[in-house]
Amino acid sequence: MITLESLEMLLSIDENELLDDLVVTLLATPQLAFFFEKYPSLKSALLNDLPHWKETLKQRLRTTQVPPDLEKEFSCYQRSQSIDNQAFQTRLPAIMDTLSNVESPFLTQASQLITAPERTLGQKVTSGLHALFLQRWRLSLTLQTVSLHQQLMEQEREILLDELQQRLTLSGKLEPILAENENAAGRLWDLSAAQRIQTDPRPLLDFGAFLQRQPALQKLAERLGRSRETKSILTQEAPKEAFRVSVREPATVPEQVSGVHQSDDILRLMPTELVTLGISELEYEFYRRLLEHRLLTYRLQGESWREKITERPVVHQQNEQQPRGPFIVCVDTSGSMGGFNERCAKAFCLALMRIALADNRRCYIMLFSTGVVKYELTSADGLEQAIRFLSQSFRGGTDMSACLSALLDKMDDALWHDADAVVISDFIAQRLPDEVVNKVKSRQTQLQHRFHAVAMSDHGKPGIMHIFDHIWRFDTGLKSRLMRRWQHGKAY
């Protein structure tokens, strides 16, 4: 069996030109033009897929078999090209039978060429007639091949247009929620290319609307997600440099009384010592202390300053920004995190997903209560996983140590070794084991990993929260909620 691509190549048909015409026609459809006008950021993302579309269409041409009748006619044409006029005249009846059997569109024109009025019955086929016959036959085969190509491409166009409309509809709805910049729009478009989302995307829209009504929560996510720290790197084998410092030294020439000390200086003897010399019982004590240089005398000395030059190693510190790694977010799904806390935690994760898409990062969610459930929101099926995560209910106990252990194991993966760990909880839980605490501290000191805590309650246990580098508080109490709503309404 011969493929359509091979037939086009043998007939010297430029398939790239045909594919370009298909793409231009597809992009000019009113449906796509409307979406491009409404969502311009998605247009550039869609245009980046053009090479992929063409490759997909070429692959379809490679796998599409030519109909048997067309293949049989083309084989007969190839055999007719390699024979001379006499052999062609001999095989002409068989050629006409083949054209008739395959119901070739060229049959009528071939009969007209053979039975032309200017040709007498039994006249030999000339070289000119032979060439004209083959030329017209080739043109007929080319038209049939192009027609088959267009039928196939029309089917692909309808399939592709239907897929694009679904992707554009979904991406258009999610663009205000997840597409912060051109990079995010491109990644959102790539996420929509996964298998067609079977679940309702309404949870994404609902939590996106909830996040917009909670600007303080969104701002907190921005501060956490965009926070950067610097670390100092000492230069190895630093050279030495001259270091000048002023040094105060006592002068050798006495200038003024600077204190009292023990000595044998009779000229600067204190009056109390002279009193002992006038008492006969203490006279020997005076001479003993004189010999031992223990008499209290005034200290007279001056002060001078001089510049001292020493050498020390040059120590330069390079303040380098830590690269923005992926997010690993641990979400507490215990019963105490239900209700408004649950909605805030999910909306916060959605905000981190938005930041991850904009900054070309990855976002991994781990839910912990009595077990650990995992979602990667930026994978190929990230939208599907995000919908399942947002539809998850928060019920159960709190096993934070198991989640932190799973988080540390995840950070051992080379793809996640520079991740920022975020724990969202009310931190009303049991004390963490010393083994887990030591592992966290070891990563903080040796690998400079950062651990963030997002506290949804003011009643969290300090013994748990002290292991985190940063504690971001979002009070979900009724008073704080009313204050935020009042401030939000006042701003508008």
From Swiss-Prot:
One GO cellular component this record assigns the protein to is:
cytosol
Q: Does the keyword Nucleotidyltransferase apply?
A: no
Q: Where are the transmembrane segments?
A: none
Name its cellular compartments. Cytoplasm
Task: Please provide the record's keywords in A-Z order.
Answer: Chaperone, Cytoplasm
Gene3D superfamilies (alphabetical): von Willebrand factor, type A domain (3.40.50.410)
Q: Does the keyword DNA repair apply?
A: no
Q: Which InterPro entries match?
A: Uncharacterised_CoxE, Uncharacterised_ViaA, VWF_A, vWFA_dom_sf
According to its UniProt record, which protein family does this protein belong to? Belongs to the ViaA family.
Family annotation (PANTHER family): PROTEIN VIAA
Describe the task this protein carries out: Component of the RavA-ViaA chaperone complex, which may act on the membrane to optimize the function of some of the respiratory chains. ViaA stimulates the ATPase activity of RavA.
What assembly does the database describe for this protein?
Homodimer. Interacts with RavA.
**Protein name, as recorded:** Regulatory protein ViaA
